[in-house]
C-alpha cells in the first residue's frame, strides 16, 4: 500500500511538471494573468476614457454647434421680425399719412363746396331782394301814377265845380236870378251866400248858367254876400231890392263859360214900374 502510494506520488510530480500545473507555477501564472488582466483593464479603461472623452468632445462640439445654430437662427428670426415690424410701422405710418392727406383734401373740398353754396345763397338772396325792391318800386310808381290820375280827375272835377260857381256868380252879377230881383223876403244869394232884408212886394226871377273848365289841381274858396234893402212909398206894398255879391277864387287855373237868361226878371221889373207909375198918377 505504501509502495503504491509512493509510486503514484512519484509519478504525479513529473506529470504535473510537464503540464505546468504545479502549485508554484499556478501562483506565477495567476500573477501574470492578473497583470495581464490589469493591463487589459487599464487599456480598456484608457480606451473607454478616450472614447468617453471623444464622445464628450463630440457631444460638446455638437452642443456648441447646436447652440451656435440656435443663436444664429434666433438672431436671424429677430432680424426678420424687426424688419417686418419696421416695415409694418412704415406701412402704418404711410397709411396714416395718406389717410390724413385724404381727410385734409376732403375737408378742403367740403369747405370749398360750403363756401360756394354760401356765395350762391347770398347771390340768390341779393337777386331776390333786388327783384323785390324793383317790384316795390314798380308798385310805388303805379300807385303814384294812380294818385296822379286821381289828382287829375279831382282837379278836373274841382275845375268844373269852379266853372259852375263862376257861372253862378256871373248870373248873380248879371242881374238874373234871385239875387237881383224883388221878392217878399228881400234878396237871396247862392254859392255860400247870405242875404238879409225886409220889404213887401212881388217878383220872380229866373236864372240859369252852365260852366265847364279844366286845369291843374288847386284849392278853391268862395264867399258870396248879398245884402238887400227895400224902398218905396209907405203902404204901397211895392219894394225893390238891390243885392251885392263878391266871389274870391285862389290858386285855380282853368276856364269857364257862363250864360244867363234874365228875361223873366226884366219882365217882372217892367210890370212893377208900370204899376208904380199908375199908382202915382192915381
Swiss-Prot record:
Record's GO cellular component terms: plasma membrane; side of membrane
Positions where lipid (GPI-anchor amidated serine) attaches: 259
Glycosylation positions in this chain: 180, 192, 257
Primary localization class, coarse: membrane
Skewed-composition ranges (Low complexity): 236-264
Disulfide pairings: none
Name under which the protein is recorded: Predicted GPI-anchored protein 23
Annotated source species: Candida albicans (strain SC5314 / ATCC MYA-2876) (Yeast)
Gene responsible for this protein: PGA23
Amino acid at each position: 500500500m505504501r509502495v503504491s502510494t509512493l509510486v503514484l506520488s512519484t509519478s504525479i510530480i513529473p506529470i504535473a511538471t510537464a503540464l505546468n500545473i504545479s502549485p508554484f507555477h499556478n501562483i506565477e501564472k495567476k500573477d501574470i494573468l492578473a497583470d495581464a488582466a490589469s493591463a487589459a483593464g487599464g487599456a480598456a479603461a484608457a480606451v473607454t476614457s478616450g472614447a468617453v472623452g471623444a464622445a464628450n468632445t463630440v457631444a460638446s462640439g455638437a452642443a456648441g454647434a447646436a447652440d451656435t445654430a440656435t443663436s444664429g437662427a434666433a438672431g436671424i428670426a429677430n432680424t426678420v421680425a424687426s424688419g417686418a415690424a419696421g416695415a409694418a410701422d412704415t406701412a402704418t405710418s404711410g397709411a396714416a399719412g395718406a389717410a390724413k392727406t385724404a381727410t385734409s383734401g376732403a375737408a378742403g373740398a367740403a369747405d370749398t363746396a360750403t363756401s360756394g353754396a354760401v356765395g350762391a345763397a347770398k347771390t340768390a338772396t341779393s337777386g331776390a331782394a333786388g327783384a323785390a325792391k324793383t317790384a316795390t318800386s314798380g308798385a310805388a310808381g303805379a300807385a303814384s301814377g294812380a294818385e296822379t290820375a286821381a289828382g287829375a280827375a279831382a282837379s278836373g272835377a274841382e275845375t268844373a265845380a269852379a266853372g259852375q260857381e263862376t257861372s253862378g256868380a256871373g248870373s248873380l252879377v248879371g242881374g238874373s236870378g234871385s239875387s237881383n230881383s224883388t221878392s217878399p223876403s228881400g234878396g237871396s244869394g247862392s254859392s255860400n251866400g247870405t242875404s238879409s232884408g225886409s220889404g213887401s212886394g212881388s217878383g220872380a226871377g229866373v236864372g240859369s248858367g252852365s260852366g265847364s273848365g279844366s286845369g291843374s289841381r288847386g284849392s278853391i274858396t268862395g264867399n258870396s254876400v248879398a245884402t238887400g234893402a227895400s224902398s218905396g212909398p209907405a203902404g204901397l206894398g211895392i219894394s225893390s231890392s238891390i243885392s251885392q255879391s263878391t266871389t274870391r277864387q285862389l290858386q285855380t287855373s282853368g276856364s269857364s263859360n257862363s250864360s244867363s237868361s234874365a228875361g223873366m226878371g226884366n219882365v217882372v221889373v217892367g210890370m212893377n214900374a208900370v204899376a208904380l207909375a199908375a199908382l202915382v198918377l192915381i
